[in-house]
């Protein structure tokens, strides 16, 4: 059977992201996907593309000026590759890297970071992490005080999503 990549709609909550990743990891079959996402006027989205027990890949979109709060993933090594736009990455001491299209950053587990979408156009990132986050590896995101922080929370600078009508990456 020929596998055909299809557009995947974004997950709009942290719970939905992890539910989809768990479901994808359970399939045990090859997965094909498109690097395609609707662009944003405001907010951010995550689209789980593929997952196994040991790895995940997501397409992330941030509106221009979008950001998140300083945090770490204590059980997950992960990397970002900028596909469109640009982002400034920060650690606890300040600026760590300014990245544009086709540039990336690797963050070992426990590394504190945050980033800010610096281009006028929306930021599109490919995020790959290992291992797949699961409830037994809780908490999966912590703030600088070591306290759990939810990805789609006000504390993590989450705002409501507004899509750009008819505008897509990929």
Residue ranges and their predicted role:
Residues 70-71, 89-90, 107, 113-119, ...:
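Short beta-strand His + acidic residue motifs that chelate non-heme Fe in jelly-roll/DSBH
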Residues 1-56, 69, 140-170:
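A short, N-terminal "cap"/entry segment at the start of jelly-roll beta-barrel domains
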Residues 93-110:
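Short acidic-glycine-tyrosine-enriched beta hairpin
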Residues 47-51, 60, 69-74, 91, ...:
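Short histidine-centered beta-strand/loop micro-motifs
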Residues 79, 106, 120-139:
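A short hydrophobic beta-strand segment most commonly corresponding to one strand
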Residues 61-63, 72-89, 128-131:
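Short, conserved beta-strand element in jelly-roll/cupin
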């Amino acid at each position: 059977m020929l596998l055909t990549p299809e557009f995947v709609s974004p997950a709009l909550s942290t719970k939905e992201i992890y539910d989809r990743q768990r479901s994808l990891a359970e399939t045990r079959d090859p997965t094909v996907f498109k690097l395609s996402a609707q662009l944003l006027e405001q907010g951010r989205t995550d689209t789980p593309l593929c997952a196994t027990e040991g790895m995940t890949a997501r397409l992330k979109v941030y509106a221009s000026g979008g950001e998140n709060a300083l945090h770490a993933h204590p059980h997950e090594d992960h990397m970002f590759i900028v596909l469109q736009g640009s982002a400034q990455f920060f650690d606890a001491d300040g600026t760590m890297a300014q990245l544009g299209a086709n540039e990336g950053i690797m963050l070992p587990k426990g590394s504190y970071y945050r980033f800010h979408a610096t281009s006028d156009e929306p930021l599109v990132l490919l995020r790959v992490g290992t291992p797949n986050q699961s409830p037994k590896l809780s908490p999966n995101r912590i703030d600088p005080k070591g306290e759990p922080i939810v990805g789609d929370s006000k504390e993590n600078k989450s705002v409501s999503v507004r899509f750009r009508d008819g505008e897509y990456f990929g």
